[in-house]
Amino acid sequence: MGSKMSDPLVIGRVIGEVVDYFTPSVKMSVTYNSSKHVYNGHELFPSSVTSKPRVEVHGGDLRSFFTMIMIDPDVPGPSDPYLREHLHWIVTDIPGTTDCSFGKEIVGYEMPRPNIGIHRFVFLLFKQKKRQTVLTAPLSRDRFNTRKFAEENELGSPVAAVFFNCQRETAARRR
């Protein structure tokens, strides 16, 4: 039980608010601008996350396929996230041991634009039962529901997740 409580995904309320508790079984790395690695709970500035990151799957093999979802559960703001969740990106059919560029982008990358407070931006990786299990994109980016999407597309529980914090940059902080 002790290890669950110290899990950064539990502390960051990703587990609970976005997905149910799961045991990671695959390693996923997310890197912006080839040098900014995403670590759970660390802060990145909006100016450094404008272009899509490299998301690598360190697991499975070329015959296994994964779906990656990026969401913001803190819209419009973390104190009253009544628009939860906002969908930022979905890539499906990513072969194991490769990265998102080898998959099929069904929802294009949308850069984080947090207006109120500190937002969490969450990357979730799901293992597909087979290729082309996720065929249709959600109708809207607004009020996306990761649990429901995973259920509708038979994705099961996530196999990996990582999140970063991001807040609006003020002119003073940019200097």
Swiss-Prot record:
Pfam families: PBP (PF01161). Keywords: Cytoplasm. GO terms for biological process: negative regulation of flower development; vegetative to reproductive phase transition of meristem. This is CEN-like protein 2. Its main location: cytoplasm. The keyword Protein biosynthesis does not apply. It comes from Nicotiana tabacum (Common tobacco). GO terms for cellular component: cytoplasm; nucleus. PROSITE patterns: PBP. The keyword Cytoplasm applies. Belongs to the phosphatidylethanolamine-binding protein family. It is found in: Cytoplasm. Expressed in vegetative axillary meristems but not in the main shoot meristem. May form complexes with phosphorylated ligands by interfering with kinases and their effectors.
